[in-house]
């Protein structure tokens, strides 16, 4: 059962606003910090130096990068559709940040306790497709357009598998509410009965975030950064931060849906460790896995990505859903 501070019961709107500001600020700051963490981890795994010039150990590199982006010229191509061109990064950033309001970080910490939390996430993921379409088309650049079309086709395709892979979890928990899904995992995390759904969700999540090895929409060697090739300054920075926000979002959803959210391993009760600690540790692990995938895996061809989705992920997701439904019906009988 959700517990809130006594003052929050008298001031529910103020409490929700404070939670929203705190969580969203933390998410954006962590997403910005991730660029530094990714560069350091990749350098460590590849046995080379990462950023090490700005501050002790290069720890102020992210500050230097942010200042550089903020003071770059805010340029719009002459032949671009200016309104749509400016709208695209705002849509990308807004959908990424808004998706976080349904994530329960602890039993008491969360912006919105929606009964349709998962459906809200899927809705935001669907709207996010328009950001790359707007950016690709409005730039009036062939590389941008190709990147935008690739991104739209890939994202819409893998969102189908993403949604179907979630239905097994919803069927077991009996709810679309993420807080209730976490509470349903007190006896056993859903990674055990839904391992196949977990694998499909991870693959689809990486594809939806356009991260390596599914980064064909931004393939530097083929499309010169894809749909945001014409963007610079803060507009490009919003696309950049939105990508890392999505990484944290997918990692947080993996933890919430399959690894018990804020619940301690083996249902341990350790009084001096707050529930939010377990949520942060689990999420950080999967964020590191995103970075490791970039350093370890090759990029397949675009047709291979689409074939893998429709010929492998979709059948497996449907099998997982049917088997889960059959097991639930047999248990009820």
From Swiss-Prot:
Alphabetized InterPro entries for the sequence: NADH_UbQ_OxRdtase_su1/FPO (IPR001694), NADH_UbQ_OxRdtase_su1_CS (IPR018086)
EC numbers for this chain: 7.1.1.-
Subcellular location, record wording: Cell inner membrane
Keyword Transit peptide: no
GO terms for MF: NADH dehydrogenase activity; oxidoreductase activity, acting on NAD(P)H, quinone or similar compound as acceptor; quinone binding
Catalytic reaction equation(s): a quinone + NADH + 5 H(+)(in) = a quinol + NAD(+) + 4 H(+)(out)
Membrane topology: Multi-pass membrane protein
Any single GO BP term: aerobic respiration
Top class in the EC scheme: translocase
GO CC terms of this entry: plasma membrane
Tagged with keyword tRNA-binding: no
Chain ranges passing through the membrane: 17-37, 91-111, 116-136, 156-176, 188-208, 244-264, 272-292, 310-330
Alphabetized UniProt keyword annotations: Cell inner membrane, Cell membrane, Membrane, NAD, Quinone, Translocase, Transmembrane, Transmembrane helix, Ubiquinone
Pfam families noted in UniProt: NADHdh
HAMAP family given in the database record: NDH1_NuoH
Listed NCBIfam families: PRK06076.1-1 (NF004740), PRK06076.1-2 (NF004741)
Annotated function: NDH-1 shuttles electrons from NADH, via FMN and iron-sulfur (Fe-S) centers, to quinones in the respiratory chain. The immediate electron acceptor for the enzyme in this species is believed to be ubiquinone. Couples the redox reaction to proton translocation (for every two electrons transferred, four hydrogen ions are translocated across the cytoplasmic membrane), and thus conserves the redox energy in a proton gradient. This subunit may bind ubiquinone.
The family this protein is said to belong to: Belongs to the complex I subunit 1 family.
Assembly notes: NDH-1 is composed of 14 different subunits. Subunits NuoA, H, J, K, L, M, N constitute the membrane sector of the complex.
Full protein name: NADH-quinone oxidoreductase subunit H
Organism of provenance: Acinetobacter baylyi (strain ATCC 33305 / BD413 / ADP1)
